[in-house]
Amino acid sequence: MESDKSLLSAELNSEFEQALYEQMLLKAKQEMQNRLPNTPESKQIRPQPGFCIKTQTSEKAKIFINICKTNDIPAPPDLSEAELVNILESDDPSGYRVPMSIGEPHVEVDNSGNGCTVYDIVINSTFFDKMKSNELFREFFITVAMEGLENKYEMELSRDWRMLKNRKFMGSISDQNIRTKSKPIIQELDTSSSQTLQSKPLISEIQSSPKVPEYTIAAEPSEGHPSFLVAEISLPNVTSVRSLVLDLGEDRIVLWGRPDLYHLDIFLPYNIVQEESGAQFNRDTKVLTITMPVQTI
């Protein structure tokens, strides 16, 4: 396949090009950070109690999960039951995400006087009300919440759970720190050098039969533990940044180009600092460049 010279390559052919490439990356990163508003990256919230479920780990350890609510966390898209079923039956049901904050484990005492481990999970208040009154959404959310706990704390939870009656929470509910969403994640560039900042959508909608775009990922420096990663994604059919939905995980890039254009879901070789990452879409080259600082060892 003939390479596209508009894309930066991780393999440069000369020391001069290598030095020029590094200067461009560092300059772009510095400019993006200078344009970001100087606002707090996180804030402390006091969640409200909702309900509590009881389950256990694969080692039979008793686990309680407090499902809490707050207006400080955004709600997922408001779907009907039929729309949720269609998403769950699709090839990639992960496109529908529920924003949530998963707290640290804390030890409490149950009604029998025995010690137990409790986790607090906080979601949007409006979605909580819908989920609590709708069995399908409740089953879906609890499954997603358990998967979140399993991934974060590397454990296996039984799906045989029950909701506690007449008890909204186990133990005490602590304040949680949540990241604010004030930073723009995608910046649009054109020949006039004017840039339109777009907020990062938290959730993307499922599209049918999207195309996987061509991309490259470069590490800087190229040897040893890198300081940051740069991903370049070729999107020739995208005309505006408004059609892009970008979601950066700790070690993952998920990108949607709407309507029904592109879908990219890849894992990164290193964990990144999500809140310090940024992206630029160049309307001339149709290339989305994502600069991602790498977590230190």
Curated annotation (Swiss-Prot):
Annotated function: Involved in the assembly of C/D box small nucleolar ribonucleoprotein (snoRNP) particles. Recruits the SWI/SNF complex to the core promoter of rRNA genes and enhances pre-rRNA transcription. Mediates interaction of TELO2 with the R2TP complex which is necessary for the stability of MTOR and SMG1. Positively regulates the assembly and activity of the mTORC1 complex.
Predominant location: nucleus
Q: Where does the protein end up?
A: Nucleus
Q: Please give the family membership noted in the entry.
A: Belongs to the PIH1 family.
The answer to whether keyword Transcription regulation applies is yes
Which Pfam families does the entry mention? PIH1, PIH1_CS
Xref: InterPro entries: PIH1/Kintoun_subfamily, PIH1_N, PIH1D1/2/3_CS-like
Any GO BP annotation: rRNA processing
Q: Does the keyword Nucleus apply?
A: yes
Keywords, comma-separated and alphabetical: Nucleus, Transcription, Transcription regulation
Question: Any one cellular component term from GO for this entry?
Answer: R2TP complex
Can you say what this protein is called? PIH1 domain-containing protein 1
**Recorded superkingdom:** Eukaryota
